[in-house]
C-alpha cells in the first residue's frame, strides 16, 4: 500500500529511506518547498500529483519522518505507523543521533541501514486489521442509519404535535380575550347611554332649538370647539403672493436627458485651457524608499530588561529542560489571541500557532539556555520565514533589463477605494526619480471620474496619460497603450484598472483578459492594511479568478505577482494583515503606502513587522 518511507534531518540529509514502488517526480522535495519552508508544518497532510504525504517531527533530534502513498487509498494506520517508527528509530540510534546533532560533520549513513522497517509495518497493519474487524460487529437497530431515521421522525412528529397544541391554546386565548373585550365595550356603551338619557331629561326642549347668529345650534358649537382644541387645522391654500415669495429660493431641476446649457458644459470641461487654471508640477527627486528601523543595539538592551508584553507568558516554562505539549497548549492559546488582536486572520493565526508548537514540542534546552529566548527565537524565525519572499522582485533591475527593447508594463488591481490610482502615482514618482520615462494608461473605463483623477496625477508628475475615454474595452486600451509606449520610447507603462469586488465575475473576467492578453510584466494587488479576513478573501479570489477565468491558449497563465499594502501609517502595531495575505498566497509585499504624499511609499522591513507583531 505504501510507496515510500523516508527519515531525514531538518538540514536535508536522508538517514534512511525505503521505496516500495517507483516514485514519479520528487514529492518529498515538493513537501519541503511548499509546506515545510513556508511554515505550514501544522498541516497534517499534503497532496501532489497522485500522491498523498504525511509526516511527523522529532524536534529533540531535528528529524522528519515522511510516508508517501497513493491518494486514492484511505490508510487508517498511517498516524500510528509514523509514531511507532519514530519511537523505535530514536530508541535504536539515540547515541548516533546525538553525535549527529552536535556535529554536522559526523555523518555515518550506513549505520542506519540496519533499521528493520518491514517488521514494524507488518505489526501496525495487523493491529489495524484486528481493530477494523472488532469494529465491524453487528450494530443495534437504534445505531443503524434506518434506526436513527425512524427515531428522528418520531421526535419530529412529537415536536409538531406539541407545536399544534401550543398554537391551538394561543388561538383559544385570543378568542377569550376578544370576547372579554366585546363584553367590556358593551357595558361601557350602556353606561354612557344611560348618562345621556338623564342629561336630556334635565334640559328643556326649547334650549335644543336655540340657534346662534350664524344659525348653528349650541351642540354644533361645542363640536367645533372640541375640534379646534384638538389641534386639527384645515390646510389653507397659499396665496399667490406667498407662493411667489417661497419659490424664489428653489433651483430648477436638471433632467438627465435634457440639453446642457453653455454654463453646464463649461463646468464639465476638464481640458488644459479650462479657466486658464495653472497646474502645480511636482519636483521629482530621489527619496529613501526603505522603512526606518531601530538599531539592532536596541535588541541587546531589551534582553537586559525584565520580560514584558506577550513574552511574559513563557516565564511559566522556566526550569523545564524539555518542552512538552502540555506546557505549550495554554501559552500557544494566548499567543493565538495575541495574533488576532494584531489583526491576523483567525484561521491564519491558528495555523501559525500550530506550526510554532510543532517546532517547539520535544525541544531540549541547553544547560544555561532560557526557555523565553528559545521560544521567542522560534516565533521570530517562523514569522520571518513567512514574510520572506520566495520570489525576489526587483522592479528597477527588471525595467533596466528590457529598457530600449520594449516598455515594462505594471497592472494595478484591487477592490474599490483602496487607493490604486494614488499608489500607481507614487510608483510612477519613484520610477521617474530613478531616471525612467513613465506613461500612465487609463484602463478604468467604468468608474465616472477615474480618467480625470488619473489626469490630475499625470499633470502634477509631468508624465503622459494614454486614454480612450469611458465604456471601452480595458484590454484593448492597455494593448494600444503598450504599443504607443513602444513606438514613442517609454520605459514603463503603469496601467490603472477598475476597482471591482472579488465575486463580480464579469469584471474579474475582464481583468483576467487584460492581464493575459497583453502578457504584462507585473500584476500587483493593492489592498488595505486595515482589513483582516476581508483582505485574505479578496487576494485569494483575485488570484484564483485571474487563472480560472482566463480565456487564452497560453501555457503560462498570469496571476498576482506582488502586493501593495496601503494606509499602513494608520494601523500602529496592528500589522496582522501583512501576515495573513502573505501566508495565504505566498505573494510578497513589495510596497507599503504610508501617507498622502508621492514620497510616502516604503519597502517593507521584515524585522520591524516581526517586532510589532510580537510586542
From Swiss-Prot:
Cited InterPro entries = AAA+_ATPase, Longin-like_dom_sf, P-loop_NTPase, Sig_recog_particle_rcpt_asu_N, Signal_recog_particl_SRP54_hlx, SRP/SRP_N, SRP54_GTPase_dom, SRP54_N_sf
Q: Does the keyword Glycoprotein apply?
A: no
Membrane topology, as annotated: Peripheral membrane protein
| An annotated GO BP | protein targeting to ER
Cellular component annotations (GO), alphabetically ordered: endoplasmic reticulum membrane; signal recognition particle receptor complex
**Subcellular location(s) per record:** Endoplasmic reticulum membrane
Record keywords:
Endoplasmic reticulum, GTP-binding, Membrane, Nucleotide-binding, Receptor
Provide the residue span(s) of the region labelled Disordered: 131-257
In the UniProt record, the signal sequence range is none
Could you give a GO molecular-function term held by this entry? GTPase activity
Q: Where is the composition biased (Basic and acidic residues)?
A: 139-181
Coarsely, its chief localization is endoplasmic reticulum
Q: Name one Pfam family in it.
A: SRP54_N
Q: Which family does it belong to?
A: Belongs to the GTP-binding SRP family.
Reported function: Component of the SRP (signal recognition particle) receptor (SR). Ensures, in conjunction with the signal recognition particle, the correct targeting of the nascent secretory proteins to the endoplasmic reticulum membrane system. Forms a guanosine 5'-triphosphate (GTP)-dependent complex with the SRP subunit srp54. SRP receptor compaction and GTPase rearrangement drive SRP-mediated cotranslational protein translocation into the ER.
Tell me how this protein assembles.
Heterodimer of an alpha and a beta chain.
Descriptive protein name = Signal recognition particle receptor subunit alpha
What is the protein's species of origin? Dictyostelium discoideum
Upper classification of the organism: Eukaryota, Amoebozoa, Evosea, Eumycetozoa, Dictyostelia
Amino acid at each position: 500500500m505504501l510507496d515510500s518511507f523516508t527519515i531525514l534531518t531538518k538540514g536535508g540529509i536522508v538517514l534512511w529511506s525505503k521505496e516500495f514502488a517507483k516514485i514519479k517526480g520528487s514529492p518529498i522535495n515538493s513537501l519541503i518547498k511548499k509546506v515545510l519552508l513556508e511554515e505550514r508544518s501544522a498541516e497534517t497532510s499534503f497532496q501532489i500529483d497522485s500522491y498523498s504525504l504525511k509526516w511527523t517531527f522529532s524536534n529533540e533530534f531535528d528529524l522528519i519522518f515522511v510516508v508517501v502513498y497513493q491518494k486514492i487509498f484511505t490508510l487508517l494506520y498511517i498516524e500510528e505507523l509514523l509514531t511507532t517508527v519514530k519511537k523505535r528509530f530514536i530508541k535504536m540510534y539515540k547515541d548516533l543521533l546525538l553525535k549527529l546533532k552536535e556535529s554536522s560533520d559526523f555523518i555515518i549513513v550506513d549505520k542506519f541501514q540496519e533499521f528493520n522497517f518491514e517488521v514494524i509495518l507488518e505489526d501496525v497493519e495487523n493491529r489495524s486489521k484486528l481493530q477494523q474487524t472488532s469494529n465491524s460487529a453487528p450494530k443495534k437497530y437504534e445505531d443503524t442509519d434506518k434506526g436513527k431515521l425512524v427515531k428522528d421522525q418520531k421526535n419530529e412528529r412529537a415536536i409538531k404535535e406539541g407545536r399544534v397544541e401550543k398554537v391551538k391554546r394561543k388561538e383559544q386565548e385570543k378568542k377569550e380575550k376578544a370576547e372579554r373585550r366585546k363584553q367590556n365595550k358593551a357595558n361601557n356603551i350602556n353606561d354612557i347611554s344611560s348618562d345621556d338619557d338623564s342629561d336630556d331629561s334635565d334640559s328643556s326642549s326649547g334650549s335644543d332649538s336655540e340657534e346662534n347668529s350664524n344659525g348653528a345650534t349650541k351642540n354644533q358649537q361645542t363640536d367645533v370647539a372640541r375640534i379646534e382644541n384638538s389641534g386639527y387645522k384645515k390646510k389653507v391654500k397659499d396665496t399667490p403672493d406667498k407662493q411667489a415669495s417661497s419659490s424664489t429660493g428653489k433651483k430648477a431641476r436638471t433632467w438627465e436627458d435634457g440639453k446642457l446649457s453653455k454654463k453646464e458644459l463649461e463646468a464639465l470641461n476638464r481640458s488644459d485651457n479650462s479657466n486658464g487654471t495653472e497646474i502645480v508640477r511636482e519636483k521629482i527627486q530621489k527619496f529613501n524608499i526603505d522603512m526606518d528601523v531601530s538599531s539592532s543595539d536596541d535588541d541587546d538592551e531589551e534582553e537586559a530588561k525584565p520580560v514584558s508584553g506577550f513574552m511574559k507568558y513563557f516565564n511559566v516554562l522556566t526550569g523545564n529542560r524539555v518542552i512538552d505539549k502540555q506546557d505549550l497548549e495554554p501559552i500557544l492559546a494566548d499567543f493565538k489571541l495575541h495574533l488576532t488582536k494584531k489583526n491576523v486572520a483567525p484561521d491564519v493565526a491558528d495555523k501559525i500557532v500550530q506550526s510554532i508548537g510543532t517546532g517547539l514540542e520535544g525541544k531540549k534546552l541547553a544547560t544555561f539556555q532560557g526557555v523565553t529566548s528559545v521560544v521567542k527565537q522560534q516565533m521570530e524565525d517562523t514569522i520571518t520565514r513567512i514574510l520572506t519572499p520566495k520570489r525576489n522582485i526587483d522592479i528597477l533591475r527588471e525595467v533596466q533589463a528590457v529598457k530600449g527593447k520594449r516598455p515594462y508594463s505594471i497592472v494595478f488591481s484591487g477592490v474599490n477605494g483602496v487607493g490604486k490610482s494614488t499608489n500607481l502615482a507614487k510608483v510612477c514618482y519613484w520610477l521617474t526619480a530613478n531616471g525612467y520615462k513613465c506613461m500612465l494608461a487609463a484602463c478604468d473605463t467604468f468608474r465616472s471620474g477615474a480618467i480625470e483623477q488619473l489626469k490630475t496625477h499625470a499633470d502634477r508628475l509631468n508624465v503622459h496619460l494614454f486614454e480612450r475615454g469611458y465604456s471601452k474595452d480595458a484590454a484593448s486600451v492597455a494593448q494600444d497603450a503598450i504599443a504607443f509606449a513602444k513606438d514613442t520610447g517609454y520605459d514603463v507603462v503603469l496601467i490603472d484598472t477598475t476597482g471591482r469586488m472579488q465575486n463580480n465575475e464579469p469584471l474579474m473576467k475582464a481583468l483576467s483578459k487584460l492581464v493575459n492578453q497583453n502578457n504584462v510584466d507585473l500584476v500587483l494587488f493593492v489592498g488595505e492594511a486595515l482589513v483582516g479576513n476581508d483582505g485574505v478573501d479578496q487576494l485569494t479570489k483575485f488570484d484564483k479568478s485571474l487563472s480560472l477565468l482566463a480565456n487564452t491558449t497560453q501555457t503560462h497563465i498570469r496571476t498576482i505577482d506582488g502586493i501593495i499594502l496601503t494606509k499602513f501609517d494608520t494601523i500602529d502595531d496592528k500589522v496582522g494583515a501583512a501576515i495573513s495575505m502573505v501566508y495565504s498566497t505566498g505573494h510578497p509585499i513589495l510596497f507599503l503606502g504610508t501617507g498622502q504624499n508621492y514620497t510616502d511609499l516604503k519597502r517593507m522591513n521584515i524585522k520591524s513587522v516581526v517586532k510589532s507583531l510580537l510586542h
